[in-house]
């Protein structure tokens, strides 16, 4: 801001385009005061308010005006359009996220069956990626094709795959793929060479990888990997003794004792916070199931629909990703305190 003031001090030749009602790049250092207080710095400014909207219906604009009018210190501005009034906004008060997802899928199916819209006409917005889990499950169960824009499908996310691999490694000792996935997650000093030695031992002795892992001292493992393998085998042994605790508790225990959650907490980044939210969502989704087998069977059923050329798909994305896009039918989920807006923004009016 100071650089602009110095450059324009003599000729006052500054042209600025902005929106005084939003500051979506505050996390990158943008300051909304540069817009709100611009006329103080340049009293001779000519202001042109662009308040005609060419995309939305008046119903949507009225709702937006109603919300945005509560902004502190804003410049008065009412959006309008010459388009038709449009459909009314529908508010559905759901009991929880399961009820919410069921209602959305029901509405989408109803409108699609009536021939009034294609799958690609529908978009579902959420604040955090973790919220997509229940939506993906319900869409897959209803055989509705979908895509996740600007992100990865819930069960394809790295941390979710890691957590499920721990669970599968405990429940199924012969699941070599899952064991190898988490053998060095978090890092235990077990590299590819150590895994190769275990593979060679298993092949030479005609045993499974899990059995080779249990006999790692005989496989010629050396260096830091010795401690890492000892800790891992001890962890899997402890978790196996608690397999009857149920999937939710076993997941929580595995992630805590392995140090996985601690590593994410110590990272203190937005990405790590998102991964923690995804893991919390996964653990919560496992609570209704009594056994790990039942839960893992349900997870295996939530698989992506077959890809087809030019296939029409329902779109799932965060609100941030959705900026500038248009859809005939939009659902916004999780409109509740602590989620929308985030609980981290509630104490700061500027964040709201």
What are these model-predicted stretches?
Residues 1-37, 52-56, 254:
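Conserved helicase NTPase motor core
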Residues 10-13, 19-21, 42-46, 84-89, ...:
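Short glycine-/polar-rich loops that comprise or flank the Walker A/P-loop
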Residues 18-21, 28-32, 52-54, 64-65, ...:
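A short beta-strand-to-loop transition that corresponds to the Sensor-1 phosphate-sensing loop
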Residues 21-26, 55-56, 148-171, 183:
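Short alpha-helix plus adjacent loop in nuclease-associated cores
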Residues 23-26, 56-62, 69-70, 76-77, ...:
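Switch/connector loops and helix/strand junctions flanking conserved nucleotide-binding motifs
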Residues 24-28, 48, 92-93, 344-352:
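Flexible beta-alpha connector loops of hexameric P-loop NTPases
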Residues 43-46, 51-145, 168-173, 242:
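Helicase P-loop NTPase motor core
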Residues 132-144, 157, 164-352:
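Conserved helicase C-terminal RecA-like lobe
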């Amino acid at each position: 801001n100071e650089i602009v003031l110095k450059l324009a001090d003599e000729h006052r030749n500054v042209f600025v385009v902005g929106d005084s009602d939003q500051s979506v790049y505050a996390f990158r250092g943008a300051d909304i005061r540069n817009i709100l207080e611009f006329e103080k710095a340049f009293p001779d400014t000519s202001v042109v308010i662009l308040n005609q909207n060419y995309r939305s219906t008046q119903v949507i604009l009225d709702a937006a005006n109603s919300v945005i009018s509560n902004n502190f210190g804003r410049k008065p501005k009412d959006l309008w359009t010459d388009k038709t009034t449009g459909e009314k906004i529908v508010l559905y008060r759901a009991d929880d996220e399961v009820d919410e997802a069921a209602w959305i899928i029901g509405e989408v199916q109803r409108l699609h069956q009536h021939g009034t819209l294609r799958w690609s006409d529908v978009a579902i917005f959420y604040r955090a990626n973790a919220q997509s889990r229940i939506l993906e499950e319900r869409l897959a169960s209803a055989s509705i094709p979908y895509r996740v824009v600007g992100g990865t499908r819930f069960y394809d996310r790295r941390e979710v795959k890691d957590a499920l691999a721990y669970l599968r490694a405990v429940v199924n000792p012969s699941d070599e793929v899952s064991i190898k996935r988490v053998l060095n997650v978090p890092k235990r000093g077990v590299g590819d060479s150590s895994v190769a030695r275990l593979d060679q031992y298993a092949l030479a002795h005609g045993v499974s990888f899990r059995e080779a892992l249990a006999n790692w001292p005989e496989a010629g493992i050396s260096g830091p990997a010795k401690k890492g393998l000892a800790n891992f085998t001890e962890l899997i042994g402890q978790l196996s003794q608690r397999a009857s605790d149920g999937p939710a508790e076993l997941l929580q225990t595995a992630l805590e004792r392995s140090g996985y959650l601690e590593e994410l907490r110590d990272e203190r980044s937005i990405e790590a916070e998102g991964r923690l939210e995804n893991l919390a969502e996964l653990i919560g989704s496992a609570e209704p199931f009594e056994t790990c087998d039942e839960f893992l069977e349900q997870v295996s059923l939530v698989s992506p629909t077959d890809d087809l050329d030019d296939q029409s798909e329902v779109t799932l994305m965060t609100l941030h990703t959705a900026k500038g896009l248009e859809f005939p039918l939009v659902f916004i989920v999780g409109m509740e305190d602590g989620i929308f807006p985030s609980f981290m923004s509630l104490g700061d009016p500027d964040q709201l």
